[in-house]
């Protein structure tokens, strides 16, 4: 039986190229490709994020009220501060220190993001 891996999470956006720049600046993701159709970003590991624009035919509209994945960051407080300083709506850090700390934020398209410390 072959192993299973999660390869990408899809997030609907209005402009994949602009959104890719924001995700790169705010979360340190590497832009692999970006077009009017979509943008693929990656970080450490094998998973990626695919930002899907209207030209892709995706049926979901930007502004998801729930996170399609979580983003593991090295410094939760620093990431939260950077997002807030750059105008993103951010929630309070919550969770249990011995299990997982997290906060939510919104990207410029209003999609909910979940950022975690593990």
Regions found by a protein language model. Give the residues of each.
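Mid-chain, well-packed structural core segment of small domains
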Residues: 69-83
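Vicinal oxygen chelate
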Residues: 1-2, 8, 85-118
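Conserved short beta-strand elements that form part of the metal-binding/catalytic scaffold
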Residues: 30-64, 112-118
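Conserved active-site tyrosine of GNAT-family acetyltransferases
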Residues: 19-24, 83, 110
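A generic "structured core" feature
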Residues: 20, 39-40, 88, 92
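Short secondary-structure junctions
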Residues: 28-34, 89-93
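N-terminal beta-strand motif that seeds the catalytic metal site of vicinal oxygen chelate
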Residues: 1-20, 47, 67-71
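Short beta-strand micro-motifs in enzyme catalytic cores
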Residues: 39, 67, 99-103
